[in-house]
Amino acid sequence: MFGKGGMGNLMKQAQQMQEKMQRMQEEIAQLEVTGESGAGLVKVTINGAHNCRRVEVDPSLLEDDKDMLEDLIAAAFNDAARRIAETQKEKMAAVSSGMQLPPGFKMPF
């Protein structure tokens, strides 16, 4: 079923992948990305754990409509969350490349 040494190799690959994923998750947690809205007038920086690290608002917006500013902050946060999710997906895909996984096997990320 697994061929010569197949089961042992499969277990070794699984352990290596688990170690790589652990390192990658630690690396991702340290990443910071910045999302923007309003053509860069509002910027939100989050880390890989989706914790907000910084919010920057252009002073010209402080005189405008409060509701609009709130919407821009939310949009900037959502942009940052999307960017970190894309980065996580790319980095985790790199971990699984080269693995001899069965066809149709879905990784948990």
Curated annotation (Swiss-Prot):
It comes from the Bacteria. Residues 1-23 are annotated as: Disordered. It comes from Sodalis glossinidius (strain morsitans). This is Nucleoid-associated protein SG0690. Keywords: Cytoplasm, DNA-binding. GO terms for cellular component: bacterial nucleoid; cytosol. Binds to DNA and alters its conformation. May be involved in regulation of gene expression, nucleoid organization and DNA protection. Belongs to the YbaB/EbfC family. NCBIfam families: DNA_YbaB_EbfC. InterPro entries: YbaB-like_sf, YbaB/EbfC.
